[in-house]
Amino acid sequence: AKDVRFGADVRALMLQGVDVLADA
């Protein structure tokens, strides 16, 4: 469960990063 939570957090950060790059 911990690994899944971590994976979800990383995925969210990646998606957020993509949004930031798209806005840049």
UniProtKB/Swiss-Prot annotation:
Sorted UniProt keywords: ATP-binding, Chaperone, Mitochondrion, Nucleotide-binding
Single annotated GO MF: ATP binding
Tissue specificity note: Testis.
GO annotations of cellular component type: mitochondrion
Localization per Swiss-Prot or TrEMBL: Mitochondrion
Function of the protein: Implicated in mitochondrial protein import and macromolecular assembly. May facilitate the correct folding of imported proteins. May also prevent misfolding and promote the refolding and proper assembly of unfolded polypeptides generated under stress conditions in the mitochondrial matrix.
Family label: Belongs to the chaperonin (HSP60) family.
Subunit details: Forms a single seven-member ring complex, in tight association with the p63 protein.
Record's miscellaneous remark: Shows ATPase activity.
Protein name per Swiss-Prot or TrEMBL: 60 kDa chaperonin, mitochondrial
Organism of origin: Heliothis virescens
